[in-house]
Curated annotation (Swiss-Prot):
Name by which UniProt lists this protein: A-type ATP synthase subunit E
Family indicated by similarity: Belongs to the V-ATPase E subunit family.
Subunit structure: Has multiple subunits with at least A(3), B(3), C, D, E, F, H, I and proteolipid K(x).
Gene (UniProt): atpE
GO CC field: plasma membrane; proton-transporting two-sector ATPase complex, catalytic domain
Annotated source species: Halorubrum lacusprofundi (strain ATCC 49239 / DSM 5036 / JCM 8891 / ACAM 34)
Membrane topology: Peripheral membrane protein
Amino acid sequence: MSLDTVVEDVRDEARARAEDIREAAESEADEIVAEAEADAERIREERLAEVDRQIDQEREQTLSSAKLEAKQERLGARRDVLEDVYDDVEAAIEGLDGDRRRELTETLLDATLAEFDDDEDVAVYTHTEDVDLVEELVEDRNAVVDGEIDCLGGVVAESDTSRVRVNNTFDSILESVWDDELKNISERLFDQ
């Protein structure tokens, strides 16, 4: 075996070893690249998913805001309609006259005076235009018209003896009925 052969064998062995190292390095590099590409793909998918979540969240928020705004507008419109109805009822009550007004006023006066003892002197207050009517209705009773109040009609009565004050005005009756029946009124108006 000559020196040339030995050198050639060493070179072949070195080349083979270099080839093995190069292949191992390429394989490792391929693994690193594949891992990096997989990481990049995972990060890209996570970011896309996050963007999709944000888009969905913003869409839901926008939709919720629009629904809330629409609901508030509907409620505002309903409130306006209910106020108009209330105003119309007030106007109808204020427009009562003749026998119907007398009948209602007398009924309210009777209910009011029933709250006081028979021997109590009762001061009665009423709507400006009803003073003559109420004076006529309190004749021969333990009551006297003592003044006017700002109301649609009906009476307010009080007694110094018992410190009782009874409000049976059309206004107070309307408010009471309105409060008690608001849900039913709303359902009838808006078919809920």
